[in-house]
């Protein structure tokens, strides 16, 4: 795999592996290869792995490393990661899933759809077509539990955040900010351009796997009617 990365401290019990800092599916593929390979080793010293756009946070048991390996924890884990990733084969599976997420683009659920279409000089139908035409990658989860950062949208859809964020955005709202699209798993304040809403519950703390989306997932948005939306809607 691509060994052009750096490792920097992230507090007392973590380090950050960083690749070139930009939104790029090839770079994210390297992140996910590192994530899955380190995860497959099932080392007790590594307590968590958190992938993002172009980085991977590695949380580790510093006390356990010092006690059992008799070496400074950060130096040992950094050397271990460097050595391991340099030897990681390019054939490592990234175990991505394909998800079809229903979205209703009805005006009652899409407060920014009309204004955004006017700003872009296209019809609302064309905007919806552009948003649903491609398969996206979930690059990371963040901001809220289970909030998927998904990209990249068609250049015609790229839009800045709202100048005045809303104090409340409903759970399931689908938005666009910059080159990204995302889904609010919970009701919260937010400044993304809301163009629709999904009936799917994206975060369930009582579930075995609380987050509906995972980094590396391949996502396609499927338009549904308002009637279908309410038939499918799951309690949040």
Identify the role of each PLM range:
Residues 2-236:
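Glycine-rich active-site loops that engage anionic ligands at enzyme catalytic sites
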């Amino acid at each position: 795999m691509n060994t052009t990365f750096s490792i920097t401290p992230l507090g007392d019990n973590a380090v950050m592996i960083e690749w070139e800092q930009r939104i790029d599916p090839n770079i994210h593929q390297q992140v996910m290869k590192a994530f899955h390979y380190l995860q497959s080793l099932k080392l007790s010293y590594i307590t968590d792995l958190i992938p993002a756009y172009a980085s991977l946070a590695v949380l580790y048991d510093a006390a356990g490393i010092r006690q059992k390996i008799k070496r400074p924890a950060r130096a040992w884990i950094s050397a271990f990661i460097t050595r391991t990733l340099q030897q990681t084969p390019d054939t490592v599976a990234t175990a991505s899933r394909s998800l079809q997420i229903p979205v209703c683009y009805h005006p009652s659920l899409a407060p920014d759809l009309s204004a955004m279409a006017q700003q872009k000089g296209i019809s609302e139908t064309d905007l919806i077509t552009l948003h649903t035409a491609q398969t996206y990658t979930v690059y990371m989860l963040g901001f809220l539990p289970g909030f998927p950062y998904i990209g990249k949208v068609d250049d015609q859809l790229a839009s800045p955040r709202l100048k005045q964020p809303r104090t409340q955005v409903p759970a399931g709202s689908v938005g666009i900010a910059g080159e990204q699209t995302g889904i609010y798993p919970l009701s919260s304040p937010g400044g993304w351009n809301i163009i629709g809403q999904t009936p799917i519950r994206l975060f369930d703390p009582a579930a075995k796997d609380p987050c509906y989306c995972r980094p590396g997932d391949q996502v396609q948005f499927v338009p549904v009617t308002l009637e279908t939306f309410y038939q499918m809607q799951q309690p949040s």
